[in-house]
Amino acid sequence: MKDKQFAIPKATAKRLSLYYRIFKRFHAEKIERANSKQIAEAIGIDSATVRRDFSYFGELGRRGFGYDVKKLMTFFADLLNDNSITNVMLVGIGNMGHALLHYRFHERNKMKIIMAFDLDDHPEVGTQTPDGIPIYGISQIKDKIKDTDVKTAILTVPSVKSQEVANLLVDAGVKGILSFSPVHLHLPKDVVVQYVDLTSELQTLLYFMRKED
């Protein structure tokens, strides 16, 4: 996410979508006001963290009144650009890629995978998913990005290919990449990269489980 108005710590930025999700849930449950303790309990953090996070955005609530749920839901929707559809592309249709292709992002948030890519000789190239997402060969990637003006990509290719494919995406105009590869990508500073390392997350979980024994 790129926002020129607010300069916030990375840890706070990572919680923005959680706050948005909670306020959407509160709104659906017809809760009109919520205090920092309620928000903290819903997310699993302490209320001081909530207040500190919110302080970066000015006056979002009033002491003794709490936070207006509808107002904050709208605020975070604007902040996360969730008021309009964001088109996304996926590169790599292995097991993880297939799982993501079948995940209906647009039914939960306003993000939509509109096309996918793999090696030109992949058997699924030239076909569509049951939801109508076309699958193209990697050699078409520049033309397709130019036609659709997609700026965001999900990368689910083997680690040994991740840098090569990421370079191709950046050359084609992509400005944001969500990478499922544990390999650190060396890209221009104006390209935003987020990493999802499932193995690392699982190892961290197991560490804390052993710590509790």
UniProtKB/Swiss-Prot annotation:
NAD(+) binds at G92, I93, G94, N95, M96, G97. GO terms for molecular function: DNA binding; DNA-binding transcription factor activity. Disruption phenotype: Expression of aldehyde-alcohol dehydrogenase adhE at both the mRNA and protein levels is significantly increased. One of its GO terms (biological process) is negative regulation of DNA-templated transcription. PANTHER family: REDOX-SENSING TRANSCRIPTIONAL REPRESSOR REX (PTHR35786), REDOX-SENSING TRANSCRIPTIONAL REPRESSOR REX 1 (PTHR35786:SF1). Modulates transcription in response to changes in cellular NADH/NAD(+) redox state. Binds to the promoter of the aldehyde-alcohol dehydrogenase adhE gene. Functions as a redox-dependent repressor of adhE expression. Homodimer. This is Redox-sensing transcriptional repressor Rex. It comes from Streptococcus pneumoniae serotype 2 (strain D39 / NCTC 7466).
